[in-house]
Amino acid sequence: MPPADIGELVAAHIRDIPDYPSPGIVFKDITPLLAEPAVFAAVVDALVRDYQHGTVDKVVGIEARGFIVAAPVAYHLGAGFVPMRKKGKLPYRTLETSYALEYGTATIEVHVDAFRPGDRVLVVDDVLATGGTAAAALELIDQASAKAVGLSFLIELSALGGRSRLPASMVRSLLRV
């Protein structure tokens, strides 16, 4: 599938769930996209396209839907996969940071040994909304003395301004709505 068509493909395979997880939020459900092997493969291919030349050592997936997309991206790039999880979900010593969400606040953690100093890290998540989660991921990567090289998202909710909280040159979204 040509890169110009990937946004249309993503748009055709997500559904809006109004008032979930709380009133006033329109949840972007990616399960229809994941259920179609050719569509899921095209999405993964599009996410790895800019990083295929050995520029990534680790791929971060942010709990929970980020895991689903980031793991195959890591596999295709020959990179390690690093889960960033909600507070209290990782069994070993962690680094942590708190941040604001579109619908509340949260804390994410990563194992203290998830990165080596200087690791080049790609962050992959399903949705860029306010940018709080992605900014928190960048903070944890920095705390670990690694270097973020990209932020890739399936969907960007442009009206929420998340891109403005992040290094704009690092942000790539397959679909901006």
Swiss-Prot record:
Its EC number is 2.4.2.7. It is found in: Cytoplasm. Keywords: Cytoplasm, Glycosyltransferase, Purine salvage, Transferase. It is an enzyme of class 2 (transferase). GO terms for biological process: adenine salvage; AMP salvage; purine ribonucleoside salvage. Its main location: cytoplasm. Pathway: Purine metabolism; AMP biosynthesis via salvage pathway; AMP from adenine: step 1/1. The keyword Chaperone does not apply. InterPro entries: Ade_phspho_trans, PRibTrfase_dom, PRTase-like, UPRTase/APRTase. It catalyses: AMP + diphosphate = 5-phospho-alpha-D-ribose 1-diphosphate + adenine. Pfam families: Pribosyltran. The keyword Cytoplasm applies. GO terms for molecular function: adenine binding; adenine phosphoribosyltransferase activity; AMP binding. GO terms for cellular component: cytoplasm. Catalyzes a salvage reaction resulting in the formation of AMP, that is energically less costly than de novo synthesis. Belongs to the purine/pyrimidine phosphoribosyltransferase family. Homodimer. This is Adenine phosphoribosyltransferase. The lineage of its organism: Bacteria, Bacillati, Actinomycetota, Actinomycetes, Acidothermales. The gene is apt.
